[in-house]
């Protein structure tokens, strides 16, 4: 049962998404989070209260041409991705070290297992839209470990040893404190 007082009085929930039906959410009414390279809209337990405790969330990612979904992994969630427009170029490395690269077209479904390292990008000339369903009720930034943030926490001397490049190269790299989520290739 939904607590209507909490649902309709919570300032974190945009009024445009609220309906008299507790099971209905207007994703199109959520202001997208904008990035250089695309945008993200999502429904999760913080803005769609019926999801609390259900271990479910949904995202709509739009990548502009040249946009990249930052290489990342989710420690506690798998995801199912449905391409609704455009072509996504995928790279996925699973927990067994299997590495796959492929293109996903409209109506193709891509599964990224929990803990797998993955990303997709838009190498095309039109926007790419991917609908993502995850088995977590948390917002994307609460169950997402991006490569930029991860590499920023490793000392330059260690990265130098791994890649065989002078430590100064890594010391001069921009430090990233949060997952970027979406970026643009240069």
Regions found by a protein language model. Give the residues of each.
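A short, N-terminal "cap"/entry segment at the start of jelly-roll beta-barrel domains
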Residues: 1-60, 64, 70, 160-186
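Short histidine-centered beta-strand/loop micro-motifs
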Residues: 50, 70-74, 101-102, 121-122
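Beta-strand cores of secreted/periplasmic/IMS beta-sandwich domains, seen most often
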Residues: 60-62, 84, 120-121
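Short acidic-glycine-tyrosine-enriched beta hairpin
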Residues: 63, 80, 94-115
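Glycine- and acidic-residue-biased ligand/ion/polar-headgroup-sensing regions
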Residues: 65, 74-95
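Intrinsically disordered, low-complexity regions enriched in proline, serine, glycine
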Residues: 71-73, 92-93, 100-101, 129, ...
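Ligand-binding loop in jelly-roll beta-barrel domains
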Residues: 78, 89, 105-106, 114-140, ...
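A contiguous, mid-protein "functional segment" used to position or interact
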Residues: 126-174
